[in-house]
């Protein structure tokens, strides 16, 4: 297999099954653009998508109940989906399966730290030179299996680091704790978070990061007058608020 040329420089959303996948629905409903959407496992049964990443063999879903609640959804997907579904082996019962390019990925990045399906999807995006990666539902907050949560998150963040070092823009759902995204800005820098005037990081319009004291940061948003909704939206014209552009 060769990298997919049409993905070079494009914006791709990877959607997993964590709680922050609801942020994907919010993003879509407010016009956020994705050139492609990649579904992780059973998310493919819920949202529109262009590709599925399912690194478990199809037999796990077709011949056992080992996948728990995902089993029925994934069995249906495996039997009926036309693909592409990237996985570890082909199965005659499943028309859409494509073998993941594991040889090419390991050779390209000289790395085989791949302990979960999301990491494989990120590595694939990096291999295809995707320009922007937006992650939703990639949370690794499994209370019943903390070891899996910690090891999976570590692997995903490792690959995100590799992607960012190669120039890829990475964005994480606001409600996800991946890359400490949901942590308040003045609590992200360990040690400095204990100071009376903690350090915060802000990005300029060129996406260059700068360090400020919290006291230096001034909000550019003016306080808006509180308004009540009416059926003619006359208050929006009066206060020049209009429909929000950012959420």
Predicted regions: what they are:
Residues 1-247:
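Metal-ion/cofactor- or nucleotide/acyl-coenzyme-handling active-site neighborhoods
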């Amino acid at each position: 297999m060769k990298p997919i040329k049409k993905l070079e420089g494009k914006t791709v959303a990877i959607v997993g099954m964590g709680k922050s996948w609801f942020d994907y629905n919010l993003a879509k409903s407010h016009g956020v653009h994705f050139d492609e959407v990649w579904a992780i496992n059973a998310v493919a049964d819920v949202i529109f998508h262009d590709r599925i990443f399912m690194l478990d063999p199809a037999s796990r879903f077709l011949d056992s109940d080992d996948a728990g609640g995902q089993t029925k959804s994934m069995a249906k997907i495996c039997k009926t989906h036309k693909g592409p579904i990237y996985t570890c082996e082909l199965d005659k019962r499943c028309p859409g399966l494509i073998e993941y390019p594991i040889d090419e990925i390991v050779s390209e990045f000289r790395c085989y730290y791949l302990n979960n399906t999301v990491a494989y999807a990120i590595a694939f995006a990096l291999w295809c030179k995707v320009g922007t990666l937006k992650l939703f539902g990639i949370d690794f907050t499994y209370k019943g299996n903390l070891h899996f949560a910690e090891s999976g998150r570590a692997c995903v963040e490792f690959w995100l680091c590799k992607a960012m070092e190669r120039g890829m823009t990475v964005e994480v759902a606001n409600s996800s704790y991946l890359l400490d995204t949901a942590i308040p800005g003045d609590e992200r820098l360990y040690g400095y978070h204990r100071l009376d005037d903690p350090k915060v990081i802000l990005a300029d319009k060129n996406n260059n990061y700068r360090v400020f004291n919290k006291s230096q940061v001034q909000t550019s948003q003016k306080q808006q007058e509180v308004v009540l909704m009416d059926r003619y939206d006359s208050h929006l014209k009066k206060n020049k608020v209009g429909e929000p552009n950012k959420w």
